């Protein structure tokens, strides 16, 4: 999926995550994370976001995530929504997403 514009999903409420996805001039995926549980779960959150991007066939993006204790399912849902918005895609392939076994 080609990232065309900046898009945001989520909120800064407790147990949520705000994720911003933008085009990346460096042609790589870069993930910046701000989390109160960085030491315990930072690597896991980054891996989860990265794997979701790979599953969505995103090859280049700048991702900024602010985590407020979100569960894995919330992190994935927010990432999926932000990527679709940033790509200008309004149709979700639920069969494909379901095949990820999340």
From Swiss-Prot:
Determine the domain of life of the protein's source.
Answer: Bacteria
Where does it primarily localize? Answer: cytoplasm
Q: Which UniProt keywords apply?
A: Cytoplasm, Phosphoprotein
The UniProt entry, under InterPro entries, shows: CitD, Mal_deCO2ase/Cit_lyase_ACP
Where does it live in the cell? Cytoplasm
O-(phosphoribosyl dephospho-coenzyme A)serine modification sites?
14
GO cellular component term, pick one: cytoplasm
Residue ranges crossing the lipid bilayer per the database entry: none
Q: Which residues form the signal peptide?
A: none
Keyword Cytoplasm recorded: yes
Pfam families in the record, alphabetically?
A: ACP
What does the subunit comment say?
Oligomer with a subunit composition of (alpha,beta,gamma)6.
What does this protein do, in the record's words?
Answer: Covalent carrier of the coenzyme of citrate lyase.
Family in the record: Belongs to the CitD family.
What is the official name of this protein in its record?
Answer: Citrate lyase acyl carrier protein
Native organism is: Streptococcus pyogenes serotype M3 (strain ATCC BAA-595 / MGAS315)
- Gene designation: citD
């Amino acid at each position: 999926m080609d990232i065309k514009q900046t898009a945001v999903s989520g909120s800064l409420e407790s147990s949520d995550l705000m994720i911003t996805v933008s085009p990346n001039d460096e042609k790589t995926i870069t993930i910046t994370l701000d989390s109160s549980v960085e030491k315990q779960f930072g690597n896991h959150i980054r891996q989860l976001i990265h794997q979701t991007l790979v599953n969505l066939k995103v090859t280049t993006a700048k991702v900024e995530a602010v985590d407020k204790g979100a569960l894995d399912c919330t992190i994935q849902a927010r990432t999926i929504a932000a990527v679709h918005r940033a790509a200008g895609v309004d149709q979700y392939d639920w069969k494909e997403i379901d095949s990820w076994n999340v």
